[in-house]
Swiss-Prot record:
Binding positions (substrate): 155, 181, 192, 278, 400, 405
Gene: argJ
SUPFAM superfamilies given in the database record: DmpA/ArgJ-like
Gene Ontology biological process terms, A to Z: L-arginine biosynthetic process; ornithine biosynthetic process
Domain of life, source organism: Bacteria
Function summary: Catalyzes two activities which are involved in the cyclic version of arginine biosynthesis: the synthesis of N-acetylglutamate from glutamate and acetyl-CoA as the acetyl donor, and of ornithine by transacetylation between N(2)-acetylornithine and glutamate.
Protein's organism: Dehalococcoides mccartyi (strain ATCC BAA-2266 / KCTC 15142 / 195) (Dehalococcoides ethenogenes (strain 195))
Protein name from the UniProt record: Arginine biosynthesis bifunctional protein ArgJ
One GO location term (cellular component): cytoplasm
Length: 405
């Protein structure tokens, strides 16, 4: 079977057929160069939808509503605000989220159950509902507004995060696109910051949920910036079927290509989030192979990527590789240190548990790159995994010390 997956250079959330979006400044965030803080994603036709949500016990109101509405056979729109998380706001916050959904549904001439919702920003503050309801009614939807959607969901992000791919499989073509936000409070667990994915492929609801979970497990669930899991983490996917392909519904060759394309989209967005970590200068990629199991590989990769000591060492270009081993050792994974090989880039600094005498000045110079790859081979089995993180700088402390002031 012939197939191809191509990344489109100027792709956006509205690249797949039938999707439109619009964004506006509603006065939720402080006025800045990015004067957008409210956006709607809309499909011309009903969509099969899937979602994954935060495991944090302190969940925001929009998470509960979206989780409930995803229980219906189809959905058609997502309303998103940035600048206010609508978390820790009690019954009033829940009522605000419901009102946002109702206003969006009325404006788009659909039922509230058709609308999903997400919020991001400061915890503990009420939404300015009069401004939001008025702004929802003013939003103009267009296929051309895809990049505005990615900008409107940003908070402390320094850049928007979006991607689109075109997939060709033996005579038919479809697109998958995505946008995400996140720079701080990034340490997902069976969830993600805020992520939105669209496709014009025809996909069964059960398979869409399965495929999204598979993609999240090797992308959003493998990044960390600061070890904090957000109260609002949500990942959504809408599939409207306008590509008119044979419906992807299970373990077929077509479905495998769909999964590969979705993995590419999710990993690209996840790496963009890690790269844009608050105050970060370097993306850190942790590759673990030769583990006794996949779970052990994931445990080690995430532990090393999230270690404050590893992150600060990378920031200071300090080749203190003992910190990497210490993080691996506390991960809960099983391994024998006398079998471990450790590489910083192409330089092997540890062979079968013994230091190799690699030149530390050369290693320090290499650590000043914008992308740092650290590889551990446990030489035990076939388990392998990759995680992403970023360096930890004084700027991260400054950003978060001043966040609400």
């Amino acid at each position: 079977m012939k197939s191809s997956i191509d990344i489109l250079p100027d792709g956006s959330i509205t690249t797949p057929k039938g999707f439109k979006t619009g964004a506006i400044y509603a006065g939720i965030k402080k006025k800045s160069k990015n004067n957008l803080d409210l956006t709607i994603l809309y499909s011309d036709t009903p969509c099969v939808a899937a979602g994954i949500f935060t495991t944090n016990k302190f969940r925001a109101a929009p998470v509960y509503i979206s989780e409930h509405n995803l229980g219906f056979p189809d959905n058609r729109a997502i309303v998103v605000n940035s600048g206010c998380a609508n978390a820790g706001t009690g019954e009033a916050g829940m009522a605000d989220a419901i009102e946002m959904v109702k206003t969006t549904a009325e404006t788009l001439n659909m039922q509230p159950k058709d609308v999903l919702i997400a919020s991001t920003g400061v915890i503990g503050h009420r939404l300015p509902m009069d401004k939001i309801k008025e702004s929802i009614r003013l939003i103009g939807l267009s296929q051309r507004n895809g990049h505005d959607f990615a900008r409107a969901i940003m908070t402390t992000d320094t850049r928007s995060k979006e991607i689109a791919v075109r997939v060709n499989i033996e005579g038919f073509q479809f697109y998958i696109a995505g946008a995400a936000k996140g720079a701080g409070m990034i340490h997902p667990n069976m969830a993600t910051l805020l992520g939105f994915i669209t496709t014009d492929a025809s996909v069964s609801k059960d398979f869409l949920q399965f495929a999204l979970k598979e993609a999240a497990d090797i992308s959003f669930n493998m990044i960390t910036v600061d070890g904090d899991t957000s109260t609002n983490d949500s990942l959504f996917m809408l599939a409207n079927g306008q590509a008119e392909n044979p419906t992807f519904a299970g373990d077929t060759e077509y479905s495998l290509v769909f999964q590969q394309a979705l993995n590419i989209v999710c990993q690209s967005l996840a790496k963009s989030v890690a790269r844009d970590g608050e105050g970060a200068k370097r993306l850190i990629e942790i590759q673990v192979e030769g583990a006794a199991s996949l779970e052990d590989a994931r445990l080690i990769a995430r532990a090393v990527a999230g270690s404050p000591l590893v992150k600060t060492a990378v920031h200071g270009a300090d080749p203190n590789w003992g910190r990497i081993l210490a993080a691996a050792g506390r991960s809960g994974a099983d391994f024998d240190i006398e079998r471990v090989d450790l590489y910083l880039g192409e330089s092997r600094v540890l062979q079968k548990g013994q230091r190799t005498g690699a030149d530390e000045k050369e290693l320090s110079s290499w650590l000043k790159q914008v992308e740092v790859i650290i590889k551990l081979n446990l030489n035990l089995g076939e388990g392998k995994s990759t995680a992403w993180g970023c360096d930890l700088s004084a700027e991260y402390v400054k950003i978060n010390a001043d966040y609400t002031t």
